[in-house]
Amino acid sequence: MKNNIILESNNGRRFKLVVDDNGILGTKEVPAPCRPGYEVKFLVAPDLVLNSDGSYKEEFKNLFTNFALKGTTRMSYYDTEDLSLNKAGWTIRIRKKSNKKAQQCTFKKRYPNINKTSVLKQSNVDKALNVALKEGFDTLNTGFGNGCEIDYGYSKATLSYSYDLDIATTGKGNVDIPNQEGSIAFITANAPSDLTLPLEGIREHGAVELTSYSAIMDNVIEVAIESMTIKAAKNSEELETIIEVSFKLEDYAGEIIEGKSDLQLVNELREVLYNLLHGNGYLLEKDGLKTTAVLERY
C-alpha cells in the first residue's frame, strides 16, 4: 500500500512516513511552503512628524513608549540600467548597519501584490506560497528555505524570500560598504542558483543612508521608525524624505490566544497602528517601497 501520511511540525516543515529496506519506520522531509513572517509598514508625513532640525516632534514620539535611536544603515542596490532584475521580481542589496559587525549581501525574490483587497486574507497568503512552492521556494531550498516574509503596506502586500550572506566583518559603529567593483565581484561569485538571470551590466543604485528609531506600541510590540532622505526623482538635485513606521510579528510580546492564526493577530495589530497614525493625522494613505524608490532614482 502506498504511504501518503504526511506529518507537519510547528514550524511548517513536512515529513513523510517511510519504511526502509529493513522494515524500519522512519521519516523523510518533503517540500513544503515556508511559514511566513509578517512586517506591517505605513508611511507618515515628514513635515508633520519632524521638527525643522530633523528631530522627531514630541507629540509624535508620545504615541509610543521607549522611543530611542537604534542606529544607521548604509545600503546600495544592484541592478541593470533598465532594472531587469527588479522587473523579474529580484533585488540584490548590499548594506551595513551601525549596530551589526558584518557587511551583508541579500538576494531577494519578491511576489508583489498578492492581495486583492487592502486587508490581507489567508487565501491570498496560501495562493502566493503555493506559487512560490512550484518555483522551488520551499522548506528544502538550501538558501531560501529558512523562511519568508510578507511586507504588508497600506493597500499592497508582497511575499519575499531572502538569502543573506556576510561579506566582511568591519565591526560595530560604522556603515562602510564595499565599492561598486567589490560588491559586483561578491555578487557574481555568490549568486544563488535560483537566480538564473544574467548579471552582466549590473551597477550600483545608491548609496543611501537610513536612520532607525525603535519604540513600543500599545505595550505589546516593538515598532521601527525609519527615515531616508533621497533624490526626489532621477537626475534631480531636490531631495525627499521618506519615513516609514513598521513592526514585525516576531517582535510581538503580548498574549498568544490559542487558535488565532498569525495573520489574524497581524491584522489586529495593523489596525491598532493604522488607527494610531490615521487618527492623529500623520498617515500617508499610499504605498511606497524604499527599494523601488532607490532603484528608480539612482
Give residue spans per PLM region.
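Extracellular repetitive beta-rich solenoid segments
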Residues: 2-31
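Phosphate-end processing signature that detects enzymes handling 5′-triphosphorylated RNA
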Residues: 32-298
